[in-house]
Amino acid sequence: MTRISFYYDPSCPWCWITSRWLTEVQTEREIEIEWLPFSLAIKNGELGGEDITGHLDTHSIAHRVLRVIEAIHAKEGIDRGELFTEFGKSYFIDPKLDDDNFFQATLERLNLSVSYLNELDNTDHDSALQQHIDDAVEIAGDDVGVPLIIFETSDGERVGYFGPVMRRLPTLERGLEIWDSLVVIATGPDFYELKRKRARRSKVKTTKRLFPELTKQPQ
């Protein structure tokens, strides 16, 4: 059994692709995933309204999603990974939804009360969201974003890596090859970093094949 912690921001397409790769690989490999929030709005100092990265709008929406996820996780006991998946389906996959109604549509899909919409602007959750970031950067360093995976090495040390960043969702066969190779290098005592220039946009719609119920065309 390989145990990892996966940090995510709901607005990040790279994060969504990596997370879908993990969930598919998990069907064929023994992987225990702890899903943890990583608010890019907090990390980039954008809660005050300053658009530092050019992504203020999407990061702000994602931060509000994380507040709702934390509230539901605390009150209903639903795993954060399941909640992230449902909000991600609404945000990235369902073409019928826009920013004004995807919150409510997701709650209805989960059979949860729309009263959780009140948590969107509840700043009481922000200290916990900050703590999750603090925990992540203590292991991985302050110069990382998401997707972020925390592994345990063969020496028992917890190490964090930014990535893997994938342009598209690989096939299951290819995804398993990537996972098996990643575990070998990430959990060994000597590996440090591997990075390349980001020159292409993500193809987040390649994850549609995992959700045929949302992509079927009407007869």
Predicted features, each with a name:
Residues 8, 87, 165:
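Short, histidine-centered active-site or binding-site loop motifs used for metal coordination
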Residues 11, 76, 122-125:
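Short beta->alpha junction loops/turns
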